[in-house]
């Protein structure tokens, strides 16, 4: 179970460093981190949206 501090850190990371937010949430460097890096290189907003999806909506 995530604490309030973890949720706040994830929100901040989702906005400023989306790939790091996914790594923080999953605790591993997997394909989701790579996909988010590609999204961030193409345009920042898709990277943010993908990070929010992985961190908060995907179980």
Curated annotation (Swiss-Prot):
Pfam families: Pmp3. It comes from the Eukaryota. The chain crosses the membrane at residues 5-25, 37-57. The keyword Transmembrane applies. It is found in: Membrane. InterPro entries: PMP3. Its main location: membrane. The keyword Membrane applies. One of its GO terms (cellular component) is membrane. It is a multi-pass membrane protein. Keywords: Membrane, Transmembrane, Transmembrane helix. One of its GO terms (biological process) is innate immune response. Belongs to the UPF0057 (PMP3) family. This is UPF0057 membrane protein txt-9. The lineage of its organism: Eukaryota, Metazoa, Ecdysozoa, Nematoda, Chromadorea.
């Amino acid at each position: 179970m995530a604490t309030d501090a973890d949720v706040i850190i994830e929100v901040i990371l989702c906005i400023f460093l989306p790939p790091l937010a996914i790594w923080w949430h999953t605790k591993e460097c997997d394909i989701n981190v790579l996909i988010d890096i590609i999204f961030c290189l193409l345009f920042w907003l898709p990277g943010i949206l993908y990070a929010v999806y992985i961190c908060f909506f995907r179980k």
